[in-house]
Amino acid sequence: MIRGRLAPSPTGNIHLGNAWAFMLAWLAARQAGGKVLLRMEDIDPDRARPEYAEGIMADLRWLGLDWDEGPDIGGPCGPYVQSRRVQDYARVLDVLATLGAVYPCYCTRKELRTLAGAPHPGDLGAPYPGTCRNLTIEECSRKEKEGRRPAMRLRWPDGVFAFDDGLFGPQQAGGESCGGDFALRRSDGVFAYQLAVVVDDIAMGVTQVVRGADLLSCTPRQLALYSLLGAQPPAYLHVPLLLDATGERLAKRHQSLEIRALRNAGVPAANITGYLAMLAGMIPDFVPRAPKDCVGLLSTATLPTRPLVTPADILDRLKKGTSR
């Protein structure tokens, strides 16, 4: 059975761009007769807030997106909150250490910026140059006596990792194009997203991942972890991002396009989901449409591959429920 997931980060209220990705993930699972899991990715204690988690669940339900397992209703694979799963991440990190696949990195952020040199294009930043990759036990001990606390990095395996994305087709990358050896745990003990999401998806039996195209470039990193852990990765479908009228990616700073703000402004939920259905090519024109009425209509044949720009008058259009 297909097991898809919605995996919001409770670091703010969800916005129209989040709703776009979540609706497509929900539809992909529902029209395949599958289950939908909700997982709160609150792995970063400096940014995540419980009140945002509650608000996100309320907003998703208001939009008409439900789930079969999650933080509020439980399920066989819980807990469905990353901050309560850190022991699992520690255990898997120990497994990787036993395999010789990780090593301590004592580089400070300032040193990493210096090592990076010129600005590096792409979401993953400059490749890690391997400064700490082959430190001896004595060198590690000396750095720890200096008061340095190590992060833990993956020793990138040889070769490339390939996958067939549901929208963007065949992809492959490895080594420096993936940022080189990447951190699995920060020096302050916080586990990295890449490790947490793979451990969780394996434990929860996730077979289908639908998410924004901004995460396309980090997929080979996750495939490297799947390979080392001997687990089957899910099928991936990356969808284009929504941009504002100036061409910038929608983010949590766009408060006027938060689902909560749209709701408070009197925009009906079906207007929002109908607009998103039109963008996905599920319906020819913008009309109110609930997610449940779109089941069976999602197709990669009609999904755009380029980022989608929302017009400057998007709020007025959403209120009216029409593209005119």
UniProtKB/Swiss-Prot annotation:
- Annotated binding of Zn(2+), by residue: 105, 107, 128, 132
Q: From its record, what is one biological process in GO terms?
A: tRNA modification
Q: Where does L-glutamate bind?
A: 5-9, 41, 193, 211
How, per the record, is the cofactor bound?
Binds 1 zinc ion per subunit.
- Annotated residues for binding of ATP: 252
Report the GO molecular function annotations: ATP binding; glutamate-tRNA ligase activity; zinc ion binding
- Residues forming the motif 'HIGH' region are 8-18
Q: EC number(s) per UniProt?
A: 6.1.1.-
Cofactor(s) it depends on: Zn(2+)
Gene Ontology terms: cellular component: cytosol
Output the superkingdom of the source species: Bacteria
Q: Where is this motif: 'KMSKS' region?
A: 249-253
UniProt-listed InterPro entries: aa-tRNA-synth_I_CS, Glu-Q_tRNA(Asp)_Synthase, Glu/Gln-tRNA-synth, Glu/Gln-tRNA-synth_Ib_cat-dom, GluQ/Sye, Rossmann-like_a/b/a_fold
Q: What does this protein do?
A: Catalyzes the tRNA-independent activation of glutamate in presence of ATP and the subsequent transfer of glutamate onto a tRNA(Asp). Glutamate is transferred on the 2-amino-5-(4,5-dihydroxy-2-cyclopenten-1-yl) moiety of the queuosine in the wobble position of the QUC anticodon.
What protein family does this chain belong to? Belongs to the class-I aminoacyl-tRNA synthetase family. GluQ subfamily.
What PANTHER family does UniProt report for this protein, alphabetically?
A: GLUTAMATE--TRNA LIGASE, GLUTAMYL-Q TRNA(ASP) SYNTHETASE
Q: What is this protein called?
A: Glutamyl-Q tRNA(Asp) synthetase
